[in-house]
Amino acid sequence: MINQRLFEIDEWKIKTNTFNKEHTRLLESLTSLANGYMGVRGNFEEGYSGDSHQGTYIAGVWFPDKTRVGWWKNGYPEYFGKVINAMNFMGIGLYVDGEKIDLHQNPIELFEVELNMKEGILRRSAVVRIQDKTVRIRSERFLSLAVKELCAIHYEAECLTGDAVITLVPYLDGNVANEDSNYQEQFWQEEAKGADSHSGHLAAKTIENPFGTPRFTVLAAMANETEGFVHESFKTTEMYVENRYSYQTKASLKKFVIVTTSRDFREEELLSKAKELLADVVENGYEDAKRRHTDRWKERWAKADIEIKGDEELQQGIRYNIFQLFSTYYGGDARLNIGPKGFTGEKYGGAAYWDTEAYAVPMYLATAEPEVTKNLLLYRYHQLEAAKRNAAKLGMKGALYPMVTFTGDECHNEWEITFEEIHRNGAICYAIYNYINYTGDRNYMEEYGIDVLVAVSRFWADRVHFSKRKNKYMIHGVTGPNEYENNVNNNWYTNVIAAWTLEYTLQSLESISAEKRRHLDVQEVELEVWREIIQHMYYPFSEELQIFVQHDTFLDKDLQTVDELDPAERPLYQNWSWDKILRSNFIKQADVLQGIYLFNDRFTMEEKRRNFEFYEPMTVHESSLSPSVHAILAAELKLEKKALELYKRTARLDLDNYNHDTEEGLHITSMTGSWLAIVHGFAGMRTANETLSFAPFLPKEWDEYSFNINYRNRLINVTVDEKRVIFELVKGEPLHMNVYEEPVVLQGRCERRTPNE
């Protein structure tokens, strides 16, 4: 089902020549730009008085918004950390004969917007009427991958009907607010500002907070390159700086902005560093800055592009998702993680969730250098002490990683998530396994990984309890990945990943040095308890149905399938009461199937099939994380039609606004699912036991697909068509791997026939 498709189908661009004012926020989300350091929604430079969400976000710059709940519970975090809306540095006001152009008010005769994903450049043009004049607007902008602090804009305006005075007003505006502020407060205060005829700067600092969290100062410095103007001026007001240029009939301006923050420089250095970077960019010019930026995108696409022949819609979808993921994070700063919305909106506060470890890590392992993924792991390692504090607040030993965080301290303030969705601890440990298993970097375990594993294992050992009645260890009062159920007992996935963590920790302790083991103070009596828990963990199972049961009472519900739902009631979270959702059997996202996906090699094909056929028909996929896991398992089970249906949903989740919420921002971490569904799903890539293996098939609707993976200092190209799969070793040493369960030595080029259906 197509929900809200704004853009034409194009393999490398998202573009449209239609502007629907009802979908302005959706357009802004989908045309967002970022470079890992900062990001901006696709707002119009000249401003827009209609329904719009002006959004500028700086990586790692956040504020502790005081928690707002009706009933305070012991253990709640005092604040919800939020990436806050920073100053608008993109603005360029446009006036014709003194009257401001506004695409909400002025009649639009022509409108075009194009996001070029190959280049990372957003272009827009419009022809608008203002009084008796017709004016053409053209803009081009990018956030540089080569100079991360740089935003560059080329803006032009021309009167097409006679003479007119065109005025351009490039500005910096710190009068911004968060739409999701709990108490409608402003988070910024002015620190400094200044301007002259062709430049200006504005510095703002986050207001004081009672929680002792860091304050941040952000400075934006702009330089404007223009000529042919007949008048110029500048001014500064509270939290605002502008330059103003007036032209006869036609205007052209290049606006360069450098953004520096107190995360990287001392406050007294922010302006001098910005001016230094700005001078270098201006000296080399706009075209040089653009070339350096597009060259970086060329390098990234060479490693990570996925090509689909025979389906332009899905080709556009996968490239869009890769583009937005690499715009959000590329591993340059170990202090950063991947927020679910990236730099595209304020929902979820822009903080780190377990999505990163479960969904983003496997993609980045294969599409970027190992250091990119390692930095994601180090982010959690550096927050280990905070995770121990989180566990202590709940009266537990060991470490409990937060559901939502910037510093390692928990920011989420819903009890059923903060206190109960503890399976997140397992995802952090699984990412360590995934990284070491994929890269072979065993030093990571000794230096960093084992510290996390031991601390999390101590939490699990304390969180379980022993049921004398069943002679089993259990975990009560949890929320599994399916957040449409809370406070359940013995969530199968949680129990599985808890026991697996203990098992993996025991295994890993055997490989570390005696000195490290002494440092961790791991005693044999403690290890014996862990072994006992592993051996006697309880896993809900139905002998009758021969399935793993989601939790103790799941089968006592009124079991229905999704096709029994009235489509008008979807999505459930927008139409049902929370009470009704909790009592239903409908599943928001993979739960049991999440465990089968992660620990795939531990289950038989028949176990996978029975559980998939039982749970998938009950799954509403109202989490953006859901379709990809189901697509991967459907592909493995040779359910091609179902796999492709689910893949389409994950590939075009935002482009077609499947969940009716993309106007709030993109589903960044979920975008990894479109990559996973092709590589882990259709291509059947696995890395169990440090052995790379493939079992590809080609969906009947496609002619061919191909992709690259990085694997242990090798670059491998994989191409799958109707009759064969071709592996090409582009770079690196020969590799022993498996294809359709047969051993293969890859050196140069290797070709195998795909199995006949």
Swiss-Prot record:
Q: Which residues bind substrate?
A: W354, D355, K588, Q589
Catalytic residues (UniProt): E483
- Its Enzyme Commission number(s) read 2.4.1.8
The record's listing under Pfam families reads: Glyco_hydro_65C, Glyco_hydro_65m, Glyco_hydro_65N
> What broad class of enzyme is this?
transferase
Q: Which reaction does it catalyse?
A: D-maltose + phosphate = beta-D-glucose 1-phosphate + D-glucose
Pathway, per record: Glycan degradation; maltose degradation
Family matches, as InterPro entries: 6-hairpin_glycosidase_sf, 6hp_glycosidase-like_sf, Gal_mutarotase_sf_dom, Glyco_hydro_65_C, Glyco_hydro_65_M, Glyco_hydro_65_N, Glyco_hydro_65_N_sf, Malt_Pase/Glycosyl_Hdrlase
Q: Does the keyword Glycosyltransferase apply?
A: yes
Supply one GO BP term: carbohydrate metabolic process
- Which keywords accompany this UniProt record? Carbohydrate metabolism, Glycosyltransferase, Transferase
Q: Which GO terms describe its molecular function?
A: carbohydrate binding; hydrolase activity, hydrolyzing O-glycosyl compounds; maltose phosphorylase activity
Q: What does this protein do?
A: Catalyzes the phosphorolysis of maltose, leading to the formation of glucose and glucose 1-P.
* Family per similarity comment: Belongs to the glycosyl hydrolase 65 family.
Provide the protein name: Maltose phosphorylase
Lineage from the top down? Bacteria, Bacillati, Bacillota, Bacilli, Bacillales
Name of the gene encoding the protein in the UniProt record = mdxK
